[in-house]
Structure formats: C-alpha cells, structure tokens
Amino acid sequence: MRALIIGRWQPFHNGHLSIIKEISNEVDEIIIGIGSAQKSHSLDNPFTAGERIMMIIKSLKKYNFPYYVIPIKDIEFNAVWVSYVEALTPPFDIVYSGNALVKELFEEKGYEVRKPKLYNRTEYSGTEIRKRIINNEDWKHLIPNGVINVIDEIDGENRIKRLNMKDYDIIE
C-alpha cells in the first residue's frame, strides 16, 4: 500500500519526522508532497522546493523505507486539485492529512484519509521555528540534523531574518 502526505515543510521538523516514521510502519511506500512548491523567499515560505527536498532526503537517509518526494504547486482550483495531484505522483491508496479541506477533497474522490498524530504542536511548528530563528532563540533541537545542514548550507537563518525586515539592513 502506498500513502500520500502533503505539507509545506517550512522547515521539515522533528514533528514531521515522527509522522513520516509512524506512517512508514503502516504502509509499504510514502509519497511526500512538497505543497506550495512555487513559493519561497517569504516569511511564511522561506525555502525553495529544492531546498525542502534536500531537507527531507537528508533527514530520512538513515531510515530504511521507500519514499518519493514530489513538488506540488498550488493551482487555486479545488474542484480539480485531486486530479492534479494524481497526475504528478505515483498512484496511492491512502492519504494522511490533518487539513479539513484536503480531507474533504480526497474523500470526495473515494480516498481513505487518515489524520496523523501530531507531536508537540507548540514547539514542532514551522511558524514557531521561524519565529525562534528571528528572535535568536534555541531552535536546532526541533529539527533533524539533515535540516540543520541544509539551513547552514544556504544561510537560511539569515534569509529568514532578512525576510522579517521592513527595510534592508546588514545582518551582523
């Protein structure tokens, strides 16, 4: 059985990792959709699809389960969105999502939708992690080492801080 899970993964964090590991115990393969793949360089979506793909692959490399990582752009047309996702991904049998609209759309097309267990939502949240980066608070313990490596490689900390500025300044 093959499962689909779609997220923005901005960034991929330990809560996401726990969900993926849990799903891997229930299915044979996982399709990890990079939602809003066209978005980057904004405070809500600071990382490119390619950077998010690197984060996920580097975070999952030590685990032994098959998965695919597929970028999925927004199309702003809910009535055909499931067909659009189906055209971009390998076939799948089940969808994991906590999003009510995603659940509604996939169930209308006959898919079983399961709600993944959420882990420590207060800390394991992309919004919280980005906020901590901006405020120079501890955040690295909330994400896998592979994600830390990617953020370091692309100077992602400073990118997020620059995106938070109203005017351009030099970050020391």
From Swiss-Prot:
<dbReference type="GO" id="GO:0005737">
    <property type="term" value="C:cytoplasm"/>
</dbReference>
<protein>
    <recommendedName>
        <fullName>Nicotinamide-nucleotide adenylyltransferase</fullName>
        <ecNumber>2.7.7.1</ecNumber>
    </recommendedName>
</protein>
<keyword id="KW-0808">Transferase</keyword>
<comment type="pathway">
    <text>Cofactor biosynthesis; NAD(+) biosynthesis; NAD(+) from nicotinamide D-ribonucleotide: step 1/1.</text>
</comment>
<keyword id="KW-0067">ATP-binding</keyword>
<dbReference type="GO" id="GO:0000309">
    <property type="term" value="F:nicotinamide-nucleotide adenylyltransferase activity"/>
</dbReference>
<keyword id="KW-0520">NAD</keyword>
<dbReference type="Pfam" id="PF01467">
    <property type="entry name" value="CTP_transf_like"/>
</dbReference>
<dbReference type="InterPro" id="IPR006418">
    <property type="entry name" value="NMN_Atrans_arc"/>
</dbReference>
<keyword id="KW-0547">Nucleotide-binding</keyword>
<comment type="similarity">
    <text>Belongs to the archaeal NMN adenylyltransferase family.</text>
</comment>
<keyword id="KW-0548">Nucleotidyltransferase</keyword>
<dbReference type="GO" id="GO:0005524">
    <property type="term" value="F:ATP binding"/>
</dbReference>
<dbReference type="GO" id="GO:0009435">
    <property type="term" value="P:NAD biosynthetic process"/>
</dbReference>
<keyword id="KW-0662">Pyridine nucleotide biosynthesis</keyword>
<dbReference type="InterPro" id="IPR004821">
    <property type="entry name" value="Cyt_trans-like"/>
</dbReference>
<keyword id="KW-0963">Cytoplasm</keyword>
<dbReference type="InterPro" id="IPR014729">
    <property type="entry name" value="Rossmann-like_a/b/a_fold"/>
</dbReference>
